[in-house]
Amino acid sequence: VIISGGGCAQPKLGSDGSALRLLTNLGCPATPFAPALTQIITDSAPIKGLSGIRVKAQVAVIDRKSVLHEEDGELLFADYGVSGVCVMQCARYAKEGRMLRVSLVKGMGFADAGEFRRELHHRRKNWAQRPMAELLTGLCVPRLSAALMRQADWRVTESSLCGQMTADMAERLTQTADAWLLPIRGVKGFESAQVTSGGAAVADF
């Protein structure tokens, strides 16, 4: 049996789901269509001001404590959430109530979170009189640095210095850079999706 009627992705090209309706009208079992290979919508507050920034990252969709799927590659921040090939590969698992875990430490050039933490303490000691806002200079762009510090609940002012960073602050920033959790609100619709998930239940043919 060959079924090649298309899904619902890119409806402007003619993919309107009519093949699935034909199958279900004939009594053939099918699973619901859903957008896949598309952008993920997240809470906008944690990523405010980051639109247009690209980073190397490892991303994973988390349901409670279970990792449903993970990828690594280039991530693109947007006003609505995140995009990039690695993100789009995770989209079929992204549902409201789940979390998108973003790890940036390897993309910054570190082997693991421990090495990132040690670099923070090295900079605290050697950059003691430099502004705290410059702590991540050379590791990420200033807008991303500020967002990570906000997410780690740092209170950075113009007078804050790198030497004032405490061990607890370093730990919170390390956890954020290694496992930044963004609440998922959904995915972009079929207009943005490259493919469709769901369709004819092949196990029943």
Question: Which residues does each predicted region cover?
Answer:
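An anion/pyrophosphate-binding glycine-rich loop and adjacent beta-alpha core
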Residues: 28-32, 38-167
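A glycine-rich dinucleotide-binding beta-alpha-beta segment and adjacent secondary-structure elements
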Residues: 147-205
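Short hydrophobic core segments
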Residues: 1-12, 22-24, 74-80
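Glycine-rich nucleotide phosphate-binding loop and flanking beta-alpha elements
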Residues: 8-10, 84, 94, 204
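Gly/Ser/Thr-rich active-site loops/lids in small-molecule metabolic enzymes
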Residues: 19-30
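General beta-strand structural signal in soluble alpha/beta enzymes
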Residues: 3, 30-33, 186-189
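A short secondary-structure junction signal
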Residues: 13-15, 88
